[in-house]
Amino acid sequence: DLRMSRGLGDVYKRQVQEAFAWNPGFREYFAVKATPNPFLINILKEYGCGCDCSSMTELMMADALGFQGEEIMFSSNDTPAEEFAFAAKIGATINLDDFTHIDYLEKTIGYIPETISCRYNPGGVFKISNSIMDNPGDAKYGFTHDQILEGYKILKEKGAKRFGIHAFLASNTVTNDYYPTLAKTLFETVVEIKEKTGVKMDFINLSGGVGIPYRPGEEGNDIRAIGEGVCRVYEEVLVPAGMGDVAIYTEMGRFMMGPYGCLVTTAIHEKHTHKEYIGVDACAVNLMRPAMYGAYHHITVMGKEDAPCDHTYDVTGSLCENNDKFAIDRQLPKIDMGDLLVLHDTGAHGFAMGYNYNGKLKSAEILLKENGDFELIRRAETPKDYFATFDCFDILKDMKDPYQK
């Protein structure tokens, strides 16, 4: 996996910060789940990003990197008690996913934190104009409308003083209208919450969902237009309600990191049967999205950028699963053994979604720095890593390692 450092700072400083400069309290909480590499997260930390964490290990990483207190947002679901306890210990802002977690959190840590957030799910379908973007009513996340009203009443009674609300209603949207439409839903909801419970929000978290164009020629999101759209709704809904000081938060893992990573793999096999296949030395272990979602990732054959795309291939990995294909019926230049193939836009939800099925090992991660130098920021997995959870037994003591010389 290859990452590019220059783009990471540029996208935040020159795009995201400018887009939301109208909101003094704005903060981007990078979604650690998208790309959990401490070297990359440190780059974003330099620009003032916080961390959006969803698990114990993500909290541990954020804490180890020096993120403190409200620089960490903990948004989890089906949450184990020990994760709530650690989040509270390091002062992270806890974003509750469920009404029953109010009582569960209090019993777990002995109190309700002064700063607390709740995740809202309005149900039904989420539309932009007449287009259905997603189906929140079928999602496992969040409080219902009635639950969130009651929830804030209870949290206030139990001593909470600073409140936030969060919602994620559609994934990987490529439209400048998603955040403004989501914002309108949340802004109107928090006005109602204030009127019915007396709870005034201190921050509103629009979460993620801002996507990137994966296909050449597709028009991407204009984050400045998105920021302007959110600002308009803010002034229409919140300001007249006396809530013109509410901070806006975002959690844009894919938008922040997706375009700035690629998977580099080598053609090692060609097969001519009912179709033309090119086998590469990467597989779904390194990039799961095409196999899991049927997702498109553009492929460049290095050194043949200007060659005609006059061959049709399925580009495959070696897993014992027929869906382990990076491309199906893709028009590409003639591929020879040893050619390097670059799969684009793998910087988010790429390496992070990797796994070890078939005993496959995950690749290294390399950072391409602004000066053109390369830096190893994660070594490749080894067989020793794969078998590490058996290291307290002697059942594999006679195993030979063909990689050891």
Q: For each predicted feature, which ranges?
A:
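Acidic, glycine-rich loop-and-beta core segments that form the ion-binding/anion-interacting portion
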Residues: 180-238, 245-249
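Conserved active-site and cofactor/substrate-binding residues in soluble primary-metabolism enzymes
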Residues: 35, 100, 143-146, 150, ...
